[in-house]
């Protein structure tokens, strides 16, 4: 295992310690990390392939799902390889530039995902409350604009963070008590005035999470109100089932993120390893569960996946004959 000692004298290198106090369990913790990472890759690639090859799924809700899967894959690539290197080999050394890049991409992807979840909530609102105008409101052009807006919004909101970090001096330890270059974990190492970093990080996070959650909640409240007015029990059950899968994804995505966000800033009595475990949960769990939730709830995706496996088994039987 590598030693972080030389990071005290080399200002261009940081050392990601992992989970303080649980170093002896790093190897065991790598098992769920590896499992979630594998599930993320397999599940989200499956979603992308199924939607791409099934013309009936070329609809706004599934295009938004593809955006979500793409973001989840990119976020996983930004975190899981380094996390496993830390847990398996203690390879926590990371250059300052790589640390800033990881920080930017991780937080930007989280904000992009929040934007896509908001778009999916709006999609359900239009489908349920304005079904006759659905095709005219959510056109291919509008969907493309929403995708671009998600990328631009996440990138622009996070762009100042690397520059705000770059102006700081790290005159003491360069050992980051975390598994990845989380903004506040790096800021805590700096000596000097870190108020601009703290204020900007808090403002950006609350702006995105606060606005998005309010709009998502409003969309689903209006959708639920419209669903309960439906006279057909079958239509009501179908609409509630679709919205239910979306609400599950919202809860999976935002609950650990909010808990981690507020305990990291205000829960000073909470042990450090709890902060870091929660931060890893909200990065690793949603990307792995999103495909499962949508795959189970969406009949078209489920049928397509079963068909692919059945055709694969059929080819295997023919080959053996």
UniProtKB/Swiss-Prot annotation:
- Tell me how this protein sits in the membrane: Multi-pass membrane protein
- Topological domain spans for side Extracellular: 1-27, 78-101, 163-198, 261-275
Q: List the disulfide bonds.
A: 99-191
GO CC terms for this protein? plasma membrane
Q: Specify the domain of life of the species encoding this protein.
A: Eukaryota
Pfam families referenced in this protein's UniProt entry, alphabetically: 7tm_4
Question: Mainly resides where?
Answer: membrane
Name by which UniProt lists this protein:
Olfactory receptor 52P1
- State the organism of origin: Homo sapiens
Name the lineage: Eukaryota, Metazoa, Chordata, Craniata, Vertebrata
């Amino acid at each position: 295992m590598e030693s972080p000692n030389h990071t005290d004298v080399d200002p261009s290198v940081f050392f990601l310690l992992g989970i303080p106090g649980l170093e002896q369990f790093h190897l065991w913790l790598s098992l769920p990390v590896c499992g979630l990472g594998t599930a993320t890759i397999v599940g989200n690639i499956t979603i992308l392939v199924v939607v791409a090859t099934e013309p009936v799924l070329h609809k706004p809700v599934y295009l938004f799902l593809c955006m979500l899967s793409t973001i989840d894959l990119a976020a996983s690539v930004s975190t899981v390889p380094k996390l496993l290197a830390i847990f398996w080999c203690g390879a926590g050394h990371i250059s300052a530039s790589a640390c800033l890049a990881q920080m930017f991409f991780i937080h930007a992807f989280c904000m992009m995902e929040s934007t896509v979840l908001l778009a999916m909530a709006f999609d359900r609102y239009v489908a349920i409350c304005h079904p006759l105008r659905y095709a005219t409101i959510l056109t291919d052009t509008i969907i493309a604009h929403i995708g671009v807006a998600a990328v631009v919004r996440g990138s622009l909101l996070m762009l100042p963070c690397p520059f705000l970090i770059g102006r700081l001096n790290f005159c003491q330890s360069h050992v980051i008590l975390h598994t990845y270059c989380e903004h506040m974990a790096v800021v805590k190492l700096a000596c000097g005035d870190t108020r601009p970093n703290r204020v900007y990080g808090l403002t950006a996070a609350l702006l995105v999470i606060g606005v998005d959650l309010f709009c998502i909640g409003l969309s689903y409240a209006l959708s639920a109100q419209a669903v309960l007015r439906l006279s057909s029990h079958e239509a009501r059950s179908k609409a509630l089932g679709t919205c239910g899968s979306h609400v599950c994804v919202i809860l999976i995505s935002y609950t650990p993120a909010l808990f981690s966000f507020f305990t990291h800033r205000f829960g000073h009595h909470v042990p450090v390893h709890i902060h870091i475990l929660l931060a890893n949960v909200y990065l690793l769990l949603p990307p792995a569960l999103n495909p499962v939730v949508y795959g189970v709830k969406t009949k078209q995706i489920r049928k397509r996946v079963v068909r692919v496996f059945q055709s694969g088994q059929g080819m295997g039987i023919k080959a053996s004959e």
